[in-house]
Amino acid sequence: MTSTIAIDQKLINFLMFLGLPKSLSEFIWICIPILVVVLGSTLGVLVIVWLERKISAAVQQRIGPEYAGPLGIIQALIDGLKLILKEDIIPSKGDNWLFTLGPAIVVIPIVLSYLVVPFGPNLIVADIGIGIFFWIAISSVAPMGLLIAGYGSNNKYSLLGGLRAAAQAISYEIPLALCVLAIILMSHSLSTIEIVEQQAKYGILGWNIWRQPIGFFVFLISSLAECERLPFDLPEAEEELVAGYQTEYCGIKFGLFYVASYINLLVSALFVSVLYLGGWDFSIPFLNDYLTSTDFFSQWELNETIVGIMTGIIGLGITLVKAYIFLFLAVLTRWTLPRIRMDQLLDLGWKFLLPVCLGNLLLTASFQITLL
């Protein structure tokens, strides 16, 4: 699906037409993507929390939230406001700097991951050409924040939770990266946009889920482990560690950990959509060609900008639908599988997933060599 949005220069020209200097107009344009990323990720968290509560209630044959707005849709917003208004307490014997720095180190890299998520050919904040490498690199920074938060709390449960989080992240970051490397070999590109375009050539049959089934399942498991979702929530196991690295946190700092967890889950779901499910592409060849042709929009006599916006909205909707399918599976997994032990977690990562990923990468590389 192609888009012709050139909104950056048009917005700058419009602001200059209003009398603003060019430097100020360019600065405003720089701030707009930042605002879009922050608001978009926050809205995504609110939707995920509401969906998880409703799906969890359905699994347990409950009603779920229903009083805060229609169907309880603003319950997550009210909970967020409650955390913001709570007092921020710092442990008397903890390290104030590390205790405060930990949540920031966790949240910032995860939010920056949105920069390279393509919702359409031109609906991406930063098409840097090495987007998938950027995501892998920056996502490895967040576990450092968890370890710092656990150490700065001066609490044995927090420290153990931070150590568990670091060990878990290292164990599953490698299989995740190897799955992505196999996709890169098949797509011949590090650009997230080019990976989607490569899958769009053959419609739904061109999705990488059919060409990389082993990598897809390993990617799903590794993503759940990276997001610390059940059955991989060992760093914050209530029965063992009270709340893990979050034990001493309250108020807005605790809310940052909460938000980071769901933002990370949404980012993982979006990359599942981009890497394996065709991203924004409609995936039905004849219908996709018709929707993206000029004949489809010419019947309403729309100008080029409106056409670009409409195709961009369609691509955004398709990407989110595919991503929320993964989110639905993640919520069902939470209420289906029991928590595993720490030794089982590490054995699964190092003794099973890593050899499987290496074998899958070897097969992919061998197949690509035969095509040369």
UniProtKB/Swiss-Prot annotation:
EC number: 7.1.1.-
Any Gene Ontology CC annotation: chloroplast thylakoid membrane
EC class name: translocase
Annotated TM spans: 28-48, 65-85, 97-117, 128-148, 166-186, 254-274, 312-332, 352-372
Signal sequence extent: none
Mode of membrane association: Multi-pass membrane protein
Any single GO BP term: aerobic respiration
Compartmental location: Plastid, Chloroplast thylakoid membrane
Keywords linked to the UniProt accession: Chloroplast, Membrane, NAD, NADP, Plastid, Plastoquinone, Quinone, Thylakoid, Translocase, Transmembrane, Transmembrane helix
InterPro entries per the UniProt record, alphabetical: NADH_UbQ_OxRdtase_su1/FPO (IPR001694), NADH_UbQ_OxRdtase_su1_CS (IPR018086)
Catalysed conversion reaction: a plastoquinone + NADH + (n+1) H(+)(in) = a plastoquinol + NAD(+) + n H(+)(out); a plastoquinone + NADPH + (n+1) H(+)(in) = a plastoquinol + NADP(+) + n H(+)(out)
Keyword Plastid on entry: yes
Molecular function terms from GO: NADH dehydrogenase activity; oxidoreductase activity, acting on NAD(P)H, quinone or similar compound as acceptor; quinone binding
Annotated function: NDH shuttles electrons from NAD(P)H:plastoquinone, via FMN and iron-sulfur (Fe-S) centers, to quinones in the photosynthetic chain and possibly in a chloroplast respiratory chain. The immediate electron acceptor for the enzyme in this species is believed to be plastoquinone. Couples the redox reaction to proton translocation, and thus conserves the redox energy in a proton gradient.
NCBIfam families linked to this entry: PRK06076.1-2 (NF004741), PRK06076.1-5 (NF004744)
Family stated for the protein in its record: Belongs to the complex I subunit 1 family.
PANTHER family registered for this protein in UniProt: NADH DEHYDROGENASE SUBUNIT 1, NADH-UBIQUINONE OXIDOREDUCTASE CHAIN 1
Assembly and oligomerization: NDH is composed of at least 16 different subunits, 5 of which are encoded in the nucleus.
Name of the protein in question: NAD(P)H-quinone oxidoreductase subunit 1, chloroplastic
Gene, per the UniProt record: ndhA
